[in-house]
Amino acid sequence: HAWSCSYTAKTAGGKEERITIRFKTEDGLLVKNEAYGAAFNVDRLMLADLIQLKSKMNGVGEGQVLQTREAEVKLPTSWAPGQTLSAHLKMANVPVKPTDKPLETTLTCKVGERFPARQVFASLTGDAIRLACEQDGYASSRAFIEDLGVALTLESTSSQTHYVNEIQTLDVVR
């Protein structure tokens, strides 16, 4: 199925950025497009919107594709509070340029409580599972929406920024 979501990312300083995300499921993977206004968008191939397999920036950069070459993923034995999900990824740009360095990243998410998905957005059904994640100096609070198979980011914090994401629209096409 396919679905789209638009939200406003708000900073503590009152700055707002409207972001529109479109997802479709293909062969168990999420094909995702994030549009940051009219000029810039990112195409991604993801697992559950947690683990990135491929990304391409459109409207900025040289059109390279960042591909995940190796992924070491540790899934929790159950989705019980306190369990941990982690992924260590090794990525490379294609086509490669002489100045490119290989990239590595580690995502760690601690499983929190289960709660009704409608608390994230009124039209959602079923349950959501709270995830507290860290990756490359960013901490994020996410909700894994079981019916959609996707982890929506509700809040993200780094040493420089703090964003709270307010979902405006969420349309699911089944």
Regions found by a protein language model. Name each.
Residues 1-59, 65, 91-174:
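Acidic, serine/threonine-rich low-complexity disordered tracts
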Residues 1-4, 76, 80-88:
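Glycine-centered loop/turn motifs
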Residues 59-81:
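Surface-exposed beta-loop interaction hotspot
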